[in-house]
Amino acid sequence: MATLTTRQQQIYDLIHQTIQRTGFPPTRAEIAAEFGFSSPNAAEEHLRALARKGVIELTPGASRGIRLRAEGGASPHQFSLPSMGLMQLTLPLVGRVAAGSPILAAEHIDRQYQVDPSLFSSRPDFLLKVRGMSMRDAGILDGDLLAVQRAAEAANGKIVVARLGDDVTVKRFQRKGRQVELIAENPDFEPIHVDLDRDEFQLEGLAVGLIRPAAP
């Protein structure tokens, strides 16, 4: 790894720890709050310095668009597939999901991937191919593979995979009583409001990490 200043190392460690704990990097605002910076712009300057030293990659326009890079240029948390040295856990990749059938039904499985389970904040049960850019600012882009742990409940603020009627969506979860709000991480998308007494809603799982396939 390149030689980092004390502050740069602290920020790098925070990014690493946040990904390990939540599966996703912190925002600039969260970094600024952690270190007492006056604004997210100060955090941005440190992130750019880390990017120039080659230890992280930044995705323009995404508040959580930060990727750690390991020595040799590989990213340990959002990485290219396949990686022959990391074949320890086999996960099904879920493609399109038919209405009314379980998300892990055989007809939904496009293929199997073998990955290193240590790359995720919790052990995932399946991968879901992301479609669209509604979670862009969380660093989740169209075509990414979201690692998902099956769960029937979620804490507020978690990124979840949910089924609403015939659709499966990835959003940030917020619940108050019998009302659920599914919030995009992109200002171009409005929140989805769910009435649990009226709407057909099912939580399929929690996001625990992300894989970005290599460009063809």
Curated annotation (Swiss-Prot):
A GO molecular function held by the record: serine-type endopeptidase activity
Superkingdom field: Bacteria
Site description Cleavage, residues in chain: 99-100
One GO biological process term: negative regulation of DNA-templated transcription
UniProt-listed Gene3D superfamilies: Umud Fragment, subunit A (2.10.109.10), Winged helix-like DNA-binding domain superfamily/Winged helix DNA-binding domain (1.10.10.10)
Alphabetized InterPro entries for the sequence: LexA, LexA-like, LexA/Signal_pep-like_sf, LexA_DNA-bd_dom, LexA_repressor, Peptidase_S24_LexA, Peptidase_S24_S26A/B/C, WH-like_DNA-bd_sf
Catalyzed chemical reaction(s): Hydrolysis of Ala-|-Gly bond in repressor LexA
Location of the active site: 134 (for autocatalytic cleavage activity), 171 (for autocatalytic cleavage activity)
EC number: 3.4.21.88
DNA-binding region listed in the record: 28-48
Hydrolase among keywords: yes
Keyword presence, RNA-binding: no
Keywords: Autocatalytic cleavage, DNA damage, DNA repair, DNA replication, DNA-binding, Hydrolase, Repressor, SOS response, Transcription, Transcription regulation
Subunit structure, as described in the record: Homodimer.
Functional description taken from the UniProt entry: Represses a number of genes involved in the response to DNA damage (SOS response), including recA and lexA. In the presence of single-stranded DNA, RecA interacts with LexA causing an autocatalytic cleavage which disrupts the DNA-binding part of LexA, leading to derepression of the SOS regulon and eventually DNA repair.
Family of this protein: Belongs to the peptidase S24 family.
Name this polypeptide is given: LexA repressor
Species name: Ralstonia nicotianae (strain ATCC BAA-1114 / GMI1000)
Taxonomic lineage from the root: Bacteria, Pseudomonadati, Pseudomonadota, Betaproteobacteria, Burkholderiales
